[in-house]
Amino acid sequence: MVRTRLAISVVLVSTLLLLNVKAKSVDPYKVLGVSKDAKQREIQKAFHKQSLKYHPDKNKDKGAQEKFAEINNAYEILSDEEKRKNYDLYGDEKGQPGFDSGFPGGNGGYSYSSSGGGFNFGGPGGWQNMGGGGGSKSFSFSFGGPSESSFGFGMDDIFSMFSGGSSKGKEQFGGFGSSSNAESKSKSSTVAAIKTINSQVYKKDVVDQGMTWLLLSYLPSQRGSQYHESIIEEVAESLQGALKVGRLNCETESSLCKQLGIVPRRAPRMFVYSYTSSGKATLAEYTEELVAKKVKSFCQEHLPRFSKKIDLNTFDVSAVSSQKTPKVLLLSTKKDTPVIWRVLSGLYNGRFVFYNTEVHDTSDPKIQKLGVDKFPAIVGWLSNGEKQVLKTGITVKNLKSAVQELGKLLEGLEKKNKKVSSKSQAGQAPNESSEKIPLLSRPNFDSICGENTPVCIIGAFRSSNGKEKLQSIMSKVSQKSLSRRQASTTGSQDTVSYSLLDATKQSAFLSSLDKSEFKTSSDKLLIAYKPRRGKFATFKGDMTIEEVEKFVAAVLNGDIQFTKTRQKPQIK
């Protein structure tokens, strides 16, 4: 029996030696097709191009799987500065001369890795498992390992592969290891920009921060995570300042994955954490081809959209400036809302009301009235109606610096607005109000009476006298503490808004609520409207400050019965 075991071991060792002699040392620079002074960006691009070409899921040629493994081994060396340095000096990423230079007796040695139906010889730190089909696994043997054996594993390990003998190799991985072991060694330097997400990080850095995230969910045993991460890195680099990236291990963070509704599959999954126009966070999965350009486009599509595009011909500046939150307007030659502005609208959502408009001619009287002489430009309004030209002829170095610089401009405007608001409150008598109730129009309707506002108190008038009466009453009532009660969820937006409506011009708006009730000779009426629920209630009492205040209080306390609208009301 001993002789039989010895004979088998001699045959196996001889075979391994023969294969190692035949295995040529592969130049990772040649594999990726880059020069020896190539920068990381060039290496990344070359890796993406080659990986896409030879990925086993797309390329069914016999040599594709082997070539794919070769490409991944090359990238593992060149993407790690320490391994690359060692390879340049010694021809081996571990800092030891390669096998071709003489059989080393210390730690290390390298010959290229290939993938097939059996074993995978070579590979610097365990077995690679990037891609590949048919459920096959690849193993690496490290020639020139520790003093225990020049092959990195003992004789017991050889026999345990066939007969389940010693478990030593399985526990310590000897000359063959698992994917999680191999990946953990290489990821620390190659994907440092990708943040590891756990429950605490998710709550602190991701939730309700206004920033869009590209998240990778994976299991350590899955194939392809390195390729996914290289794609994510490239996208993150091109969208720095607009996008943050993270990876979520659904094995160690199973509860968080379950909370997010992420179910692990055979391959890693990509999700974009973003915000809808209503402010609600969503998690959208990317399911298309793994190409950086397409992933980037997907991320851009899911950037915040809190800025409302307006037409300067119908933009009511007086209505905008009467609101309490500062307003900012971007004037640019772009048809679509610029990426920078969308990012800022997410980061500062709730602190500003964002608008943008497409412009081309600085000689336009409306542009000149705003005080803008160059595009792009940003104009702001304080809560007291004061206009501020924040910047004109804006130039930026890159997306990240642009978001930072323009963010500082917005924060400066916010500070001015706080000073103006505090002075206004300090100098205002208890029964005095300078609050001007805005007139509802198409540009300001969403910000005043959109779905983000729980209740709108609308004063409809048919004459100038009716308008003045409503303006006086509503401005005083709106300053009362109960009538200004804030939503507890945000603390930044009033539960109730106040506005005026020209009933002669907006008869369709009233008809959409109730076709018959508002056909009256009265020159003024008061309506409470709930946009989210599509319901309304009409004030029936005497039009006095006291009675209107009671009506608003009853609305907020839930003591008023609301009726379903005929259809969703719209402003002409």
UniProtKB/Swiss-Prot annotation:
Gene null: resulting phenotype: No visible phenotype under normal growth conditions (permissive temperature of 22 degrees Celsius), but mutant plants show gametophytic male sterility due to defect in pollen tube growth at temperature of 30 degrees Celsius.
Coiled coil segments of this chain: 394-423
Glycosylation site list: 431
Record PTM: Not N-glycosylated.
Induction: Induced by tunicamycin and heat shock. Induced by DTT and azetidine-2-carboxylate.
Domain of life: Eukaryota
Alphabetical keyword list: Chaperone, Coiled coil, Endoplasmic reticulum, Glycoprotein, Signal
UniProt-annotated location(s): Endoplasmic reticulum lumen
Polar residues biased stretches: 422-432
Stretch forming the signal peptide: 1-23
Expression sites by tissue: Expressed in roots, leaves, stems, flowers, mature pollen grains and growing pollen tubes.
Chain intervals for the UniProt region annotation (Disordered): 419-439
Gene Ontology molecular function, alphabetical: oxidoreductase activity
Main location: endoplasmic reticulum
Protein name as catalogued: DnaJ protein ERDJ3A
Source organism: Arabidopsis thaliana
Lineage, top ranks: Eukaryota, Viridiplantae, Streptophyta, Embryophyta, Tracheophyta
